């Protein structure tokens, strides 16, 4: 009888294993990503186990029960093509739904060629993001940009709440203050109109 595929909460050390798998796939995760998202929602990481071994996993982070996000979905290379990932994906979706308050929305990262699969899980294509790599050069900072440390956190939180589906105070505080990063805000007429964070990754 073949071993049973089991789903369970992931441990913090197992998340580091997934980070290594992701890096091997060229995903280029940030150095601090795992800890920040873990601190945001420690229950938001699901492991797939086969015969006592970790064979896959992914995140199902809940923001205050009002918005959920599925990401970091990966299977160990030798366990792909057997339908195990599909079972894990739907388990994660259903578990995240159970953790949210209706009518909360779920977002997700995905790969473009799997849109039909995501659609079968109830997702609708929204937008596409592209990653570019290049060698930076020193340049002057635009006069409208300020260090985010100069912006009161309450003002940043109000701006973020107006543009993100749910409050994420704990995540935001950690995200803008992570080691080695630079966080900038765009101000016009004294008001915050945007912000961004550049963070160190495996490559870049």
Where are these regions (language model features)?
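Conserved acetyl-CoA-binding loop-helix of GNAT-fold acetyltransferases
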Residues: 72-75, 81-96, 120
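Conserved GNAT acetyl-CoA-binding A-motif
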Residues: 96-111
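Short active-site oxyanion
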Residues: 5-6, 103-106, 144
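Active-site rim helix/loop that mediates acceptor-substrate recognition in acyltransferases
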Residues: 15, 19-59, 161-183, 187
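Conserved beta-strand in the GNAT
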Residues: 47, 53-61, 68-74, 185, ...
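Hydrophobic, ordered structural segments
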Residues: 107, 115-118
């Amino acid at each position: 009888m073949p071993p049973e595929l089991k789903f369970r909460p992931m441990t913090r050390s197992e998340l580091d294993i997934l980070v290594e798998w992701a890096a091997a796939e060229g995903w280029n995760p940030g150095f601090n990503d795992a800890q920040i998202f873990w601190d945001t929602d420690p229950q938001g990481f699901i492991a797939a186990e086969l015969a006592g071994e970790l064979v896959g996993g992914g995140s199902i982070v809940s923001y205050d029960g009002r918005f959920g996000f599925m990401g970091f979905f990966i299977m160990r290379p030798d366990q792909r093509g057997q339908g195990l990932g599909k079972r894990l994906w739907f388990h994660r979706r259903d578990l995240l739904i159970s953790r949210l308050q209706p009518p909360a929305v779920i977002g997700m990262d995905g790969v473009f060629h799997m849109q039909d699969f995501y659609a079968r899980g109830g997702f609708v294509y929204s937008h596409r993001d592209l990653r570019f790599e290049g060698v930076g050069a020193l340049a002057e900072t635009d006069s409208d940009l300020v260090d985010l440390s100069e912006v009161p956190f309450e003002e940043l939180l109000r701006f973020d709440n107006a543009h993100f589906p749910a409050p994420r105070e704990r995540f935001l505080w950690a995200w803008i203050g992570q080691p080695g990063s630079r966080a900038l805000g765009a101000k016009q007429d004294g008001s915050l109109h945007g912000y961004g964070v550049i963070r160190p990754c495996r490559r870049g």
